[in-house]
Regions:
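A eukaryotic "domain-start" boundary segment
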Residues: 1-17
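Residue-level signal for pocket-adjacent positions within structured domains
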Residues: 3, 13, 81, 194, ...
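C-terminal SET catalytic tail plus cysteine-rich post-SET Zn-binding segment of SAM-dependent SET-domain
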Residues: 3-5, 19, 29, 40-114, ...
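Catalytic cores of large soluble enzymes that bind and process phosphate-bearing ligands
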Residues: 12, 78, 146
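Glycine-centered flexibility motif
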Residues: 15-17, 29, 144
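Catalytic cores of histone-lysine modification enzymes
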Residues: 97-223, 227, 258-259, 265-268
Length: 287
């Protein structure tokens, strides 16, 4: 039997994390993972709900079942990811969707990725179980402007637009899924505009502003995690950066607090000199 390169472990301080199960060499591929869910970004103009590429009023072809606009590739209407909103439109709304504005961010698309998560509850319990184990930070989000916006534009919208039974689909459950998407979603720059994907093991990689791994994506949207320039010993934690490593500490901390709801205490953030780089230093122009 081939020993797995990585494993998921748990720690009282950091929760679940990914560790090396063997010694990993520098630049070694440690993980290639298919997404649990993929869908459009929350703020986006109309996109094809199959390939997730931008579409216009002239290029759009309406799905014959549900009316959601797709691109001209006939395979996109049968795409596995499109099935969620297509089924909900046909079976619950019982009326085709009509999208008329193709020039601005469209509110109907804010809920698509959340729908694709909720759809798993009754249609793929295994994926639903994995999704609901992911962190949502609902306690930290509750009461904030983004949380209340999600209540109005996603939770209330879904209940009204798709005629959902609140007993079957509680508002708090929908808002929890919104949090799971926000906290665990990876921006995938393979399309214009980029889309969002949620991965199982990939969501458990911890953050560091001096990460020992990098992430990229394969052409088909699989997450690829590769070690950085240094080897990782067996048992060592694998980390990626959730923010832009080319930002200074203040900007990184603000971004992480706003989007991931934690205060980073990695070696770089804990050192006023940013490990001797003085990356956030202000250069005096006076001699």
């Amino acid at each position: 039997m081939v020993k797995q390169l990585i494993k998921v472990a748990e720690d009282p301080m950091v929760g679940r994390y990914v560790a090396a199960n063997v010694d990993l060499a520098a630049w070694q591929v440690a993980l290639v993972e298919r997404p649990l869910i993929r869908g459009p970004s929350q703020v986006t103009g109309p996109v094809c709900l199959g390939c997730l590429k931008s579409i216009t009023a002239e290029s759009a072809v309406m799905c014959e079942r549900c009316g959601w606009p797709m691109c001209s590739d006939s395979k996109c209407a049968d795409d596995e990811w499109h099935k969620a909103e297509c089924d909900w439109t046909v079976l619950r709304r019982k009326q085709k969707v009509e999208i008329k504005d193709f020039t601005n961010p469209h509110p109907s698309y804010q809920s698509i990725t959340v729908i694709r998560c909720l759809y798993q509850k009754h249609n793929n319990p295994e994926v639903w179980a994995k999704l609901t184990k992911l962190e949502s930070h609902c306690a930290s989000r509750r009461g904030g402007s983004k949380y209340e916006a999600d209540r109005v534009w996603i939770a209330d919208y879904l209940l009204r637009f798709f005629k959902l039974d609140p007993a079957e689909w509680p508002v708090e459950e929908i808002l929890r899924v919104c949090g799971i998407v926000q906290v665990n979603g990876h921006e995938v720059p393979l399309t214009d505009p980029p889309y969002v994907a949620i991965y199982d093991t990939g969501s458990m990689l911890e953050h560091s502003c001096v990460p020992n791994c990098s992430k990229t994506f394969t052409r088909d949207g699989h997450l690829l995690i590769r070690t950085a320039a240094a080897a990782i010993d067996s048992g060592g934690h694998l980390s990626i950066s959730y923010t832009d490593v080319l930002w200074g500490t203040a900007q990184r901390l603000a971004h992480l607090a706003d989007t991931k709801f934690f205060v980073c205490k990695c070696p770089r953030c804990s050192d006023p000199t940013e490990l001797g780089t003085y990356f956030s230093g202000v250069k005096c122009t006076t001699e």
